[in-house]
A protein has these predicted regions:
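Short, low-complexity disordered leader/linker segments with a strong preference
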Residues: 1-81, 388
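N-terminal secretory/targeting leader peptides
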Residues: 51-58, 74-166, 185-388
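Hinge/lid segment of periplasmic solute-binding proteins
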Residues: 170-189
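Transmembrane alpha-helix boundary/anchor motif
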Residues: 45, 176-180, 228
Length: 388
């Protein structure tokens, strides 16, 4: 299974964000390299002109004008290249490739993509800002990474809001509240294209298996620095311990913490199965990826090109969910091969965990931070109707 690009030595945190090399400094380096290339090209053009080739200079000028005209006419269905900034997730990378193929097909070859996966354009927050200002056309990132900017995304931090992936797909994303949250990206000058899957978070421990809520009592569990997450774990009896993700592997190896919780891909992608003996598929909170596009760029395209993007993205989204499920199965195989015991909760056990987490009142905490808390009430209403 490929979770981390084998050609680079990077660590990724529990938001799927690079904690290694691909940070803002590297973006600056990329820009410097690009500038150097442009300057070199300009020097070559100048030398050619000095050689007396006036016809070639005229041709070059005409080509430049043609390119400018082509760019300006993108709204008429002319060729356009979209820069896509992506994450480290294997399923998301697969889906971007799939999207690129489909959007090229459905646009009759007028749309191509320039794909920059593995946080090459910076972390989630940086790419979010780059897409707002037009430096990047489409970006993918964890909702947890940008909820401090887009407060309604805190709804996806509520523990046991969703009890299955199908609930997430049909209600969390496809319901009225989910659609309004996706549409809400427009306040940032962005077009919400889709919600993709980062996945359910699950518990791993190094000494004590967690099969019931009682097993969590006093367990020193590394968690995210998030008030909603902390309240839920305290309500379930654990001792939540925020810690830098970069320190987690060593902390588990040395017994500084008893365990941690993350999506399966993050667990095996960082080799946690090497220092943990047990994994319980608690599926306590589901974290999505957002997929957004610069609104001005989207609106500059022709109606046919916009339709091509919508159709290709819908198909790529279904494909991403399928790939995510495939990689999760491979992650379980990886853990078991390493000697880790993986336990799935039955419905009764999961409802026990949900009842304990609910006592932490995470929904109220989320609503306090949301700009549109009525969306939380609507989501709960839709889920209750869906479960009947």
């Amino acid at each position: 299974m490929v979770i981390i690009d084998e050609e680079v030595d990077l660590l990724y945190n529990d938001k799927g964000t690079c904690t290694g090399k691909n940070q803002k400094g590297e973006i600056t380096l990329m820009k410097k390299k690009a500038l150097a290339v442009l300057m070199a090209a300009a020097m070559v053009a100048s030398m050619t002109a000095c050689g007396g080739s006036s016809d070639k200079a005229a041709d070059s000028s005409a080509a430049t004008e043609d390119k400018a005209d082509s760019s300006a006419a993108a709204g008429d269905g002319e060729a356009v290249e979209l820069v896509v900034g992506g994450v480290t997730s294997s399923s998301a990378k697969d889906a971007v490739t799939y999207f690129g193929e489909k959007v090229n097909e459905y646009s009759n070859g007028t749309i191509t993509i320039a794909d920059f996966p593995d946080n090459q354009l910076g972390n989630d927050e940086q790419r979010f800002e780059m897409t707002q200002n037009g430096e990047c056309d489409i970006s993918i990132g964890s909702t947890s990474s940008v909820s401090a900017s887009y407060h309604d995304l805190y709804l996806y931090d509520v523990y046991y809001m969703f009890l299955s992936k199908q609930e997430v797909y049909d209600v969390g994303f496809g319901g009225e509240a989910g659609q309004k949250i996706l549409e809400g990206f427009d306040q940032f000058g962005l077009k919400g294209l889709a919600m993709w899957e980062n996945g359910f978070r699950n518990v791993t421990t190094n000494n004590t298996p967690v099969n019931t809520v009682a097993d969590l009592k006093g367990l020193k569990l590394r968690t995210m620095e998030n008030s909603i997450h902390l309240a839920a774990w305290k309500a379930m009896g654990a001792n939540p311990t925020p810690m830098a993700f970069s320190e987690l592997y060593t902390a588990m190896q040395q017994g500084t913490v008893d365990g941690e919780e993350n999506p399966l891909g993050i667990i095996t992608g960082n080799g946690f199965e090497e220092v943990e003996k047990y994994c319980t598929l608690t599926e306590h909170v589901y974290t999505p990826y957002y997929v957004v596009m610069n609104a001005d760029k989207y609106n500059s395209l022709s109606a046919d090109q916009q339709a091509a993007i919508e159709k290709a993205m819908a198909e790529a989204t279904t494909y991403q969910y399928e790939q995510s499920n495939k990689y999760e199965e491979e992650s379980i195989d990886t853990m078991e091969a390493a000697g880790c015991t993986v336990t799935a909760l039955d419905e009764a056990a999961k409802l026990e965990f949900k009842a304990a987490a609910d006592s932490g009142d995470g929904l109220s905490l989320a609503k306090e931070q949301m700009d549109n808390p009525d969306l939380a009430d609507k989501m709960v209403e839709e889920l209750e109707a869906y479960r009947k």
